[in-house]
Amino acid sequence: MANHRIDRVGMEIKREVNDILQKKVRDPRVQGVTITEVQMQGDLSLAKVYYTIMSDLASDNQKAQTGLEKATGTIKRELGKQLTMYKIPDLVFEKDNSIAYGNKIDQLLRELDKKD
């Protein structure tokens, strides 16, 4: 039963953080950032927030990470207004590499098809 609640809270945080980044955070470093997944710790005290950014440049990725870290307080405050939870979890932002990994596999599969 608890797993369903953890999943629901994670989905709600994902939706709200995406909305907050688009509407409330004005930092240009986080423009184009999309939240792809939120993994909650079992006691709901920590949320790992995975994000992607449209740019492949390492400098843009670093700027986005810095911008998200700077905006964490604003995001938590806005989450507190939107969610009915006793304690808003701490947020840790990590780059989601699964999309790049999937693109790499697609490219390898296409290369195999060309060889045949």
From Swiss-Prot:
Does this entry carry the keyword Cytoplasm?
Answer: yes
- In its keyword annotation, does this UniProt entry include Cytoplasm? yes
Instruction: Supply one GO BP term.
Output: maturation of SSU-rRNA
Alphabetical UniProt keywords: Cytoplasm, Ribosome biogenesis
Pfam families per UniProt: RBFA (PF02033)
Q: Where's it mainly located?
A: cytoplasm
Q: Which InterPro entries match?
A: KH_dom-like_a/b, RbfA, RbfA_dom_sf, Ribosome-bd_factorA_CS
MF terms (GO), sorted A to Z: ribosomal small subunit binding
Q: Which SUPFAM superfamilies match?
A: Ribosome-binding factor A, RbfA (SSF89919)
Q: What are the annotated GO cellular component locations?
A: cytosol
The record's subcellular location field reads: Cytoplasm
Q: In terms of domain of life, where is this protein from? A: Bacteria
Question: What this chain does, per the record?
Answer: One of several proteins that assist in the late maturation steps of the functional core of the 30S ribosomal subunit. Associates with free 30S ribosomal subunits (but not with 30S subunits that are part of 70S ribosomes or polysomes). Required for efficient processing of 16S rRNA. May interact with the 5'-terminal helix region of 16S rRNA.
Assigned protein family: Belongs to the RbfA family.
How does the annotation summarize its subunit structure? Monomer. Binds 30S ribosomal subunits, but not 50S ribosomal subunits or 70S ribosomes.
Q: What is this protein called?
A: Ribosome-binding factor A
Origin organism is: Streptococcus pyogenes serotype M49 (strain NZ131)
